[in-house]
Swiss-Prot record:
Its main location: endoplasmic reticulum. It is a multi-pass membrane protein. This is Uncharacterized acyltransferase C1851.02. The lineage of its organism: Eukaryota, Fungi, Dikarya, Ascomycota, Taphrinomycotina. GO terms for molecular function: 1-acylglycerol-3-phosphate O-acyltransferase activity. The keyword Endoplasmic reticulum applies. SUPFAM superfamilies: Glycerol-3-phosphate (1)-acyltransferase.
Length: 279
């Protein structure tokens, strides 16, 4: 009990300290980047610990995936408020109209977890790389909340997991969030890396629509290679759904191309959001 109290006290102390420093001090660029980056991971650890508890409760109530929603919202509320880094959503109503869909999203950096927190619905689940399940606390939360894990190095296993996920989507009416590029781009330009086919096979197997989601290129706000981490707001644009009803594996390439084109166009369209143009 004494250890738990000490841990909670230390957590609260760190949290209050981070809040004060971030709000009332202007730090040099490099120090600001490392400080805010550390704060992000601190908030993630706090949210993951909360997520373990939330997921246990959600699982006992018979709806374990709700643990992901509660944890994502807690992280976004905490981190966005303290760091003053927010996302605005355009066309959010599209997400709420569909009980089940594959959400195809571009992946820029580790800060995309904030975009997840801003966008997530109560029936959403993410697909994550299998190695994350072994990360203390974070992995426990992900296991308890029924995150879909995938090992991309073993194609046969990945195919089986997608088939299982498709059955689960149809049975439970859940939507799956997929970073379809497969890796972080850290791009400063409004464009995608080539999309992987897994998300499209999943959508075809489940016979649910693909909903492309374009997260504005926010390298002017957060860009680890150049140690940039500023306050600000970025835009998330939800695009029109792409139906898969009646489609088969033979249509995957066409679906991928249609999605990729729509997302690249949207990234260019929203690139200037929140940016101060030079005169």
């Amino acid at each position: 009990m004494g250890f738990i109290k000490s841990t909670l006290l230390a957590t609260v102390t760190v949290f209050v300290g981070l809040c004060g420093i971030n709000r009332f001090f202007t730090l040099p660029k490099c120090i600001r980047y490392h400080f805010r980056y550390f704060a992000c991971h601190t908030f993630l650890a706090i949210s993951s610990a909360y997520g373990v508890i939330a997921s246990v409760v959600a699982r006992l109530c018979g709806y374990p995936v709700m643990g992901q929603y509660l944890t994502a919202k807690a992280y976004y509320g905490l981190a966005s408020t303290i760091l003053d880094f927010r996302f605005k959503i355009e066309n959010e109503e599209i997400l709420r109209k569909h009980k089940s869909a594959v959400l195809v999203v571009n992946h820029q950096s580790e800060l995309d977890i904030l975009a997840i927190g801003r966008t997530f619905g109560p029936n959403y689940s993410v697909i994550a790389k299998k190695s994350l399940r072994y990360v203390p606390i974070l992995g426990w939360f992900m296991i308890l909340s029924d995150v879909v894990f995938i090992d991309r190095s073993r194609r046969s296993d990945a195919i089986q997991l997608f088939a299982k996920a498709a059955r689960r989507m149809r049975k439970e009416n859940i939507s799956i969030w997929v970073f379809a590029e497969g890796t972080r781009s850290y791009s400063l330009k409004p464009c995608l890396l080539p999309l992987k086919k897994g998300a499209f096979h999943l959508a075809v197997q489940a016979q649910v629509p693909i909903i492309p989601i374009a997260i504005q290129t926010y390298g002017h706000l957060f860009h680890p290679p150049t140690k940039v981490f500023n306050k600000g707001e970025a835009l998330i644009k939800v695009l029109d759904p792409i139906p898969t009803e009646g489609k088969t594996a033979e249509d995957v390439n066409d679906l991928l191309h249609e999605t990729e084109t729509a997302m690249n166009n949207a990234l260019v369209e929203i690139d200037d959001y929140g940016k101060v143009k030079k005169q």
